[in-house]
A protein has these predicted regions:
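ER/Golgi luminal nucleotide-sugar-dependent glycosyltransferases, focusing on the catalytic module
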Residues: 1-141
Length: 141
């Protein structure tokens, strides 16, 4: 099984060494700076310009449209990984063989449930995004 795990990033940052990980510069149409050698989400078929509205999903769209010969595509944030042991640092992130093992028996890998009571999903969203699209969606529903 060929697995690629996109590491969505908007800036240069330390990355895992395992080749299963593919750093993707999301919003590259705006975020690119000389010297960032990540796969850019503004190449090939892309929606990079929509990154302010879709965040890391512009990288997923890029992978969906442009990655070939891959059986499974994953997504992690440049500071949030799946770890196989402690301490939670780049030396202990899941490797390609770990993902293949997990996916042999499961269709999807997700993190442990997190109980987040500080604010609602709505409040959390509007702290980082314009409220209007979410408000319009609520109206329509």
């Amino acid at each position: 099984m060929k697995v690629k795990v996109l590491v969505a990033a908007h800036k240069q940052f330390p990355m895992p060494a395992d080749p299963v990980y593919m750093p993707v510069l999301v919003g590259a149409v705006k975020n690119y700076k000389a010297g960032i050698a990540y796969q850019r989400d503004d190449e090939g078929d892309n929606i990079s310009a929509k990154n302010p509205y879709y965040s890391e999903l512009t990288g997923v769209y890029w992978a969906w449209k442009n990655l070939k010969d891959v059986d499974a595509i994953g997504l992690v944030h440049y500071r949030r990984y799946f770890y196989v042991s402690k301490p939670h640092d780049l030396d202990h992130v899941a490797k390609g063989v770990d993902y293949e093992h997990f996916l042999a028996d499961h269709d999807v890998i997700v993190p442990k449930k997190r109980n987040y009571y500080i604010e609602s999903n709505y409040d959390h969203y509007v702290h980082a995004h314009p409220a209007e699209p979410l408000d319009k969606t609520r109206e329509i529903i």
